[in-house]
Every structure is written in structure tokens, then in C-alpha cells.
């Protein structure tokens, strides 16, 4: 198979950048952009992440296999202030922190006690990552920029805003996650 043109798709920002910079006499707006739709409708999924130490697991000395694929998948629905519902999904991760960063925030606790406390809390962490469908807004877009990278290739600018509905969805997922963690 031979192709006259090959386009490497690399993601939501780099793909439009490649295509915008492919402009020539035949395609003045870049390959695949005859109708000026390239880069429009950029969206992201509203998401929240909650993490805590579960009191019930303090002091546990279980030997966890923290391999990949051990996530608990979560699905639920929540209500928005206008009474409408939206679905969301996520995952619960019961993992061990790579480094107990929380110890740095415990300035008032003596070092000898910090170490014992860290051992006590080590296996008790859980994280919830929740997300829902994003909204496609035409004005959210990747567009040709005015600056160039070190190779002289034109960069892109990104126009992105979120709606009140998106913020309400994130607030609702945060409330749901907080309720779940308080009951755990």
C-alpha cells in the first residue's frame, strides 16, 4: 500500500497542530480541515479525586499485592441543583503510597512517633477517581497559535472554558465520594 499523504494522529492537541501545519496550496487550512472544524469541540471529562486513610485499616499488616488491574469499578448517578440526574463512573484504588508525604505536614509530632504513626497508617489508604461525560462546546478549541517551537513549527493556542453544569457535576461527584468514604 502506498499513500500520497500520511497523518500521524497523536492526541487532542498535537494532532491539530500537525494538521494545521500541513497547509499548502491544495489545503490552505491544513489537511482534513476543508470546513474549519479541525480542533473544534475540544472536551474533557469532569473529574474529581478523593483520597483518605481508612480508620478501620489502621494497624493492618496485610501483605497486599498492589499489581495492576485490581481496581474496583464504581458506577452511580447523582442529582444536580435543577433536579436532573447524570451518570458517572470511576474506580477505587486501595494502594500503598510510594512515599508517605503526609508526614511532612505533621510538624507538631515528634520524629519517633511519626515513624510509628506512618507504619500504623501505611496500608490504610484508598483513593476514589470519579468522572462523567464532558460537554462538547464548539468554542472550546485548538487553533493555530502565533508562537513557534524551537524547530520553527507553529504552536497552537487553546480556548477552553467549562460550564456551570460541569462545576455542578464535579460538586455532586465530590459529595457522593465523600459520603462513600465516610461510610467505609
Question: Where are these predicted regions, by residue range?
Answer:
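FAD-dependent oxidoreductase catalytic-site/capping-region signature
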Residues: 53-61, 68-184
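Glycine-rich loop(s) and the adjacent beta-strand/alpha-helix scaffold that form part
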Residues: 1-65
Amino acid at each position: 500500500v502506498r499513500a500520497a499523504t500520511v497523518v500521524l494522529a497523536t492526541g487532542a492537541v498535537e494532532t491539530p497542530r500537525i494538521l494545521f501545519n500541513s497547509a499548502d496550496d491544495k489545503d490552505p487550512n491544513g489537511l482534513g480541515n476543508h470546513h474549519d472544524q479541525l480542533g473544534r469541540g475540544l472536551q474533557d471529562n469532569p473529574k474529581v479525586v478523593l483520597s483518605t486513610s481508612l480508620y478501620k485499616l489502621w494497624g493492618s499488616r496485610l501483605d497486599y499485592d498492589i499489581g495492576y488491574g485490581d481496581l474496583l469499578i464504581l458506577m452511580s448517578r447523582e442529582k444536580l441543583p435543577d433536579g436532573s440526574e447524570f451518570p458517572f463512573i470511576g474506580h477505587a484504588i486501595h494502594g500503598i503510597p510510594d512515599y508517605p508525604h503526609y508526614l511532612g505536614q505533621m510538624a507538631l509530632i515528634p520524629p519517633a512517633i511519626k515513624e510509628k504513626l506512618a507504619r500504623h497508617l501505611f496500608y490504610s489508604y484508598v483513593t476514589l477517581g470519579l468522572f462523567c461525560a464532558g460537554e462538547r462546546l464548539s468554542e472550546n478549541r485548538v487553533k493555530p497559535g502565533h508562537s513557534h517551537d524551537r524547530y520553527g513549527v507553529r504552536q497552537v493556542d487553546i480556548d477552553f472554558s467549562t460550564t456551570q453544569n460541569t462545576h455542578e457535576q464535579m460538586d455532586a461527584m465530590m459529595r457522593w465520594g465523600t459520603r462513600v468514604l465516610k461510610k467505609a
